A protein has these predicted regions:
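PP2C/PPM-type serine/threonine phosphatase catalytic domain
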Residues: 1-297, 303-317, 338-346, 350, ...
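Conserved HxN/HPN-centered segment at the entrance to the catalytic loop
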Residues: 326-334
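AlphaC helix of the protein kinase catalytic domain
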Residues: 355-365
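Activation segment signature within eukaryotic-like protein kinase domains
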Residues: 373-374
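Protein kinase catalytic-loop region centered on the HRD/HxD motif
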Residues: 379-389
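Conserved protein kinase catalytic/activation segment
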Residues: 398-409
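C-terminal lobe helix-coil module of Hanks-type protein kinase domains
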Residues: 437-537
Length: 575
């Protein structure tokens, strides 16, 4: 049985010597699949003492984090999800203050400090603003993991430098900590940590190891006994088990693999019409839903790869990914009300042809047609990128052009989902999944991909549509190290006969640069430059062969000289 993430929790809060408890805290341990996809969240907030409404701020901050974090996209990383939630909470709190009688006195507004920890797989993600603290127990000592955002005026006077709700823009500290079974973390407000030492904390945790609520209560009571004049809150998290690094979709599907299908056969409520495509990776069939009469495409795993667990894991993810992308330029999944009995993927049927076939049928397309297709593909890719996904295998075979000229991105078997990759970071980038001719150089260098890598693939397709060949030919397949990447020679796309101006070549050259940091910062910038001449490219000329490929220039020069010598010798001999 696969081991999952297990923790023990202890919490206690007390108003102490104050009339109102302005602290708030909470822990949420979700069920699967959210446990693997989003992790366990623990949050602690402390309302500022100068405000009579800060308890509302701290309660709102904790509740919104625990509720909204799990409503963010499952494909997002912990960092992205938590930041979006905290930024939204900060904006709401700041707006509440501006609408209240405390608009011109922020020290009396809806302001609180906050520290949060999200434990996902074997990593603790820490988010912090203010002066709550997060510690890790190290033997009999406490290792402080957060920094207090306090500005020291004198030995007796300090004030908060950062907090939720105090400014319209939020600056959050973020860090990650690798965890292992047995690790213990402590979250505490200043009413606790300023009055209780590490020796008492570790002693209380060890004494109440079987019941951590008792440890938290003992620490709070000791802080009160030692004179704490503030609200006192403590949370204790102990890691009991860390999940094996297998990934979210590594559990073998309980559904059986389907057989090869024949025309006119009935399969799981679908009537098979014919096979559309067959390859070493999968088989795709045209089918009709017997219940709705809707035409669909069914994709089943290849027989040759049915024992390949890595392939089956990626196959399981394809429909999951498709359901999280909403774009007219990305293939849409299809679902049925009845229970599925086999492992396959059902999608909309697109009547058309692959971009590869379209390029063969249209070897010299006009520039405007190319622009329209590239713009559609770029829009589809941006839908992936908004969800923190990378396609990683964009090529003409993975784009369909329907009868109306609409482009649709297909095949999600190589897609990298950042939020899922966090669950198995060492396995996430283990192999290059894309097609070599369209794969960005950084993948070959083991650097991993980014949205700029997908842009490289898109630019390579654009280049091929305009010129009929690839920008680097077969050079990409020869990359073995950084020096090989810098040796790549871009072949200019300028072609007066084809009507490709220099500024188009300039846009392509930049998007296809071997160094991802020298490409366009965003795909929209590249697409914009395909329609709007960048002044920097307007004087672009056809680069002489000597500059483009000095080695080839001297080889040709030497060959020409050799031929000339042979001719001269022949003439002399004839005399």
């Amino acid at each position: 049985m696969t081991r999952g993430l297990l923790i023990s929790v202890g919490q206690h809060s007390d108003k102490g010597r104050k009339p109102v408890n302005q602290d708030f805290h909470g822990v949420l341990i979700p069920e699967e699949p959210l446990l693997s996809l989003k992790g366990i969240a623990a949050v602690l907030a402390d309302g500022i003492s100068s405000s009579t409404v800060s308890q509302i701020a701290s309660e709102s901050a904790v509740k919104s984090f625990l509720m909204d974090y799990y409503c963010t996209s499952e494909s997002w990383t912990v960092k992205t999800s938590a930041r979006r939630v905290l930024e939204a909470t900060n904006s709401w709190l700041h707006a509440q203050t501006r609408k209240s009688q405390y608009a011109y006195d922020r020290d009396k507004g809806y302001v609180c400090t906050l520290s949060a920890m999200v434990i996902k797989a074997a990593t603790a993600h820490i988010f912090h603003v203010g002066d709550c603290r997060i510690y890790r127990l190290a033997g009999k000592a406490l290792e402080q993991l957060t920094d207090d955002h306090r500005i020291i005026v004198s030995s007796e006077q300090t004030y908060l430098g950062r907090a939720l709700g105090i400014n319209p823009q939020l600056e959050i500290d973020y860090q990650t900590v690798e965890i292992q079974a047995g690790d213990t973390f402590l979250l505490a407000t200043d009413g606790a940590y300023e009055f209780v030492d590490a020796r008492f904390v570790t002693s209380a945790i060890n004494e109440h190891a079987a019941e951590l609520d008792g440890a938290a209560k003992a620490i709070v009571e000791e802080a009160y006994r030692r004179g704490s004049d503030d609200n006192i809150t403590v949370q204790i998290l102990r890691i009991d088990a860390v999940p094996e690094e297998t990934g979210v979709f590594d559990r073998t599907s309980t559904l059986p693999l389907p057989p090869l299908l024949e025309p006119r056969a009935m399969f799981d409520g679908y009537r098979i019409i014919r096979e559309i495509h067959g390859s070493s990776r999968s088989h795709i069939y045209l089918a009709v839903d017997a219940e709705t009469e809707e035409t669909v495409a069914l994709k089943i795993p290849s027989i040759d790869l049915r024992d390949n667990q890595a392939y089956l894991k990626r196959f399981l993810m394809e429909e999951w990914i498709a359901r999280r992308i909403d774009s007219p330029y990305v293939l849409k999944p299809r679902s049925r009300s009845t229970r599925r009995n086999y492992l396959y993927v059902a999608t909309e049927f697109v009547e058309g042809q692959t971009l590869r076939q379209w390029m063969l049928d249209n070897p010299r397309p006009d520039l405007e047609t190319v622009r329209r297709i590239i713009e559609q593909i770029a829009t589809g890719l941006r839908a992936f990128h908004r969800m923190e996904m990378l396609h990683q295998d964009l090529r003409p075979d993975n784009v369909l052009i329907d009868k109306t000229g609409t482009a649709k991105i297909i095949d999600f078997g190589s897609v990298r989902v950042a939020g899922v990759a966090e669950a198995a970071p060492r396995a996430a980038d283990a192999e290059i999944l894309g097609t070599v001719q369209y794969t960005a150089p950084e993948y070959f260098l083991g650097q991993g991909g980014s949205p700029r890598s997908d842009m490289f693939s898109l630019a390579a397709i654009c280049y091929q549509m305009l010129t009929g060949h690839l920008p680097y030919g077969a050079q990409l397949a020869k990359i073995r190290g950084r020096s090989d990447a810098w040796k790549l020679r871009y072949r200019p796309a300028i072609d007066a006969e084809r009507g490709i101006p220099g500024w188009i070549d300039g846009a392509l050259r930049k998007a296809l640069h071997p160094d991802p940091y020298k490409r366009h910062e965003d795909m929209s910038e590249f697409v914009f430059e395909l329609r709007n001449p960048n002044p920097a490219y307007l004087n672009t000329r056809i680069t002489p062969l000597l500059e483009r490929n000095p080695l080839m220039f001297w080889k040709l020069t030497s060959a020409a000289l050799a031929c000339a010598v042979v001719v001269l010798l022949a003439l002399l001999h004839a005399r």
